[in-house]
Amino acid sequence: MKKTFLIFFIFIGQLFALDLNFNTFSSNFTQIVKSKNSTLSYSGHFILSKDQAYWSYDTPSKKEIYINKNQVTIVEHDLEQVIFSHLDNIPNLNEIFKKASLIDKDKLVAKYDNINYTIKLNQEQIQSISYKDEFENDVIINLNNQIKNPKINSDVFKAKIPQNYDIVR
């Protein structure tokens, strides 16, 4: 599941960097992951810059994810732990969008690494991204309250790590 989250974060960050003209971007999101036996729903907000991302999950549990290029820090409040990770296999999203096809004025499809992505637009803004992940889960991410180029304090991209949390590397 963590790999699914990380691929999505990198995907959305690169999507906005390549497809929309902006320096920073923020949005609220809901993410629904459906497997054969269950459906999980997540919500929160994210802030992106060209090289960094901050994701805050509010439900079902509080979690923050900080991405700086290919370095990832995940603060898991329910587990009182912080996970440091390095992404070696980041999808080549330039290739995804070179191969993307406009199905109609509000829908794009792209295939990369045997994963098909559907991107739905509304008035040239991304409304949702859906795909089937490597575990055969159906993933739908809906965006709302999108803001292009908000002023962002760079401190938002620095992980806030409580002293009593366990560190996992």
UniProtKB/Swiss-Prot annotation:
Family statement drawn from the similarity comment of this UniProt entry = Belongs to the LolA family.
Q: Which GO terms describe its cellular component?
A: periplasmic space
In UniProt terms, what function does this protein have?
Participates in the translocation of lipoproteins from the inner membrane to the outer membrane. Only forms a complex with a lipoprotein if the residue after the N-terminal Cys is not an aspartate (The Asp acts as a targeting signal to indicate that the lipoprotein should stay in the inner membrane).
- GO BP annotations, alphabetical order: protein transport
Keywords carried by this UniProt record: Chaperone, Periplasm, Protein transport, Signal, Transport
This protein is called Outer-membrane lipoprotein carrier protein
Organism for this UniProt entry: Campylobacter jejuni subsp. jejuni serotype O:2 (strain ATCC 700819 / NCTC 11168)
What quaternary arrangement does the UniProt entry report?
Monomer.
Q: What is its main location?
A: periplasm
Name the gene that codes for it: lolA
Q: Which residues form the signal peptide?
A: 1-17
Q: Where in the cell is it found?
A: Periplasm
A Pfam family per the record: LolA
* InterPro entries referenced in this protein's UniProt entry, alphabetically: LolA/LolB/LppX, OM_lipoprot_carrier_LolA-like
Can you tell me where the transmembrane regions are? none
Q: Which CDD domains match?
A: LolA
